[in-house]
Structure formats: C-alpha cells, structure tokens
Design a protein with these regions (language model features):
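Phosphate-binding active sites in nucleotide-utilizing proteins
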Residues: 141, 146, 156, 161-162
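N-terminal secretory targeting modules
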Residues: 1-124, 128-149
Length: 163
C-alpha cells in the first residue's frame, strides 16, 4: 500500500493534507502524478459521485468511476516503470473525494517523481472554467457524464505554456 503522504506522489490543485492517511479534494482538475513499477495500479478512494480520468505513460485518458474500496486504474501493463496521471473530472458541487493511497503489485514500488515545472498559472471562474458540458451533449440528467475539467481552457492553456 502506498499512503497518501508518500514523498514520491505529486499533488496539483487544492488538496486537504491535514490527515496523513486520507487526503481530500473537492475541486475539478486536481490531479496526482506518480511513477511506479509493476503491471497494475489501484486507487483507494471513497468517492460515490465523482468521475476521474487516468492516463498511463502519456496515453489516452480513460474515464474512471470509483467503485468500492479499490478502483482499478490500470492492469495488464508491461513490466517496468510507468507514469500515472490521475485527474478529477467533476466540479466541486459533486462532493469531496477521500484519497487513501494506491495499491501496487507485490514487489512493485513508486519511483522518484519527475521534476516540477517552473511556471504556474491560476484560473478563477465558474462552471465554464471548470469544464462544464465540454465532453458531449446535455441529454436529461447526464451533466456529470459530459464534464471534463482537464479539457477546460485552464488546463489546456497550462499545458500549451508548459506550466
């Protein structure tokens, strides 16, 4: 088990780290980066309503909805070192996520994190800034299914400027 306060984990955005065993977040587009060995990784989350996206080794994002005590983020990977990017997609009104760490394969471990970028940007706004309805058409009650904070203009501009 990798605890939330492991020094090899990198957190971005607003995280409440007052409890070393359970970090919390409530805003969209917060994320975690980690480099790990092994063939799989699971997240220990308590989060009934939110949606997340995961990218392994810079690949395409996969949509994730937390399930139970452990949510599979990736499995059947080639043995070796991998890069994880784990991003919350839904806005703050959906509630708070409790993150309790990651589960890795037996014998697997976290590796040293990548160097932090020197530029930082901050965007303040409303649901447009948060990526509301930017991932599909609103049809009834699918609001959260068509929201992706990581594809809002703030994160996109940050990536374009290498911030």
């Amino acid at each position: 088990m990798v605890a939330p306060n492991d020094a090899h984990l990198q957190y971005f955005g607003r995280w409440d780290k007052s409890n070393a065993q359970e970090y919390q977040c409530a805003q969209g587009a917060v994320y975690i980066k980690a480099n790990f060995t092994g063939t799989s990784i699971k997240a220990k989350l308590r989060d009934p309503n939110d949606k997340w996206r995961v990218s392994i080794d810079g690949g395409a994002f996969q949509k994730i909805k937390p399930r139970g005590n452990e949510t599979v983020l990736a499995e059947n990977l080639k043995p070796g070192t991998h890069k994880l990017l784990f991003v919350r997609s839904t806005e703050g009104y959906m509630g708070t996520t409790q993150f309790r760490g990651f589960e890795l394969d037996d014998g697997a471990r976290l590796e040293a994190p990548d160097p932090l970028k020197t530029r930082r940007l901050e965007f303040v706004g409303d649901s447009i800034t948060a990526g509301a309805k930017n991932d599909g058409e609103l049809k009834g009650e699918n609001y959260n299914d068509i929201e992706d904070n990581d594809q809002a203009y703030g994160p996109k501009v940050s990536r374009m400027l290498d911030a």
